Amino acid sequence: MIYGSQGAKIEIDDRLLAHLQLVIMTKLRRNEQFLFAWDHDEAYARGHTALWINPSIPLHFQYVGSRRPALNRAWTEALMDAANSAGGLRVVPEPAEH
């Protein structure tokens, strides 16, 4: 994912990115702004990052693989629930499909 006019590149696994793209684009189509936050992988660095997602901020979804991953509806719903909460969108573990 590439965020903002400075082109900050954020490495996100293709499967997670596909789910995040659906949630983020749904909210942006509704002209909603929200916080997107995640904890860093310990192999990368300790800590966390938070981004303000707003329709006026450039956002580009870039995938490594050539195929779009299949979507897990339960995961999409869990991510959307998080995005609609006061704490904003946070990466949650993928649940089993119903």
Where are these regions (language model features)?
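Short, structured protein-protein interaction patches enriched in aromatics and acidic/basic residues
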Residues: 32-64
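Short, extreme N-terminal segment that most often corresponds to the first beta-strand
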Residues: 1-13
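N-terminal intrinsically disordered, cationic/polar leader segments
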Residues: 12, 19-22
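Mixed-charge, glycine-accented linear interaction segment located at domain edges/termini
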Residues: 66-98
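Helix N-cap / beta->alpha transition motif
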Residues: 13, 50-54, 72
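Alpha-helix boundary/capping detector
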Residues: 2, 46, 50, 74-77
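Short glycine-rich, low-complexity/disordered patches
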Residues: 30-40, 89-98
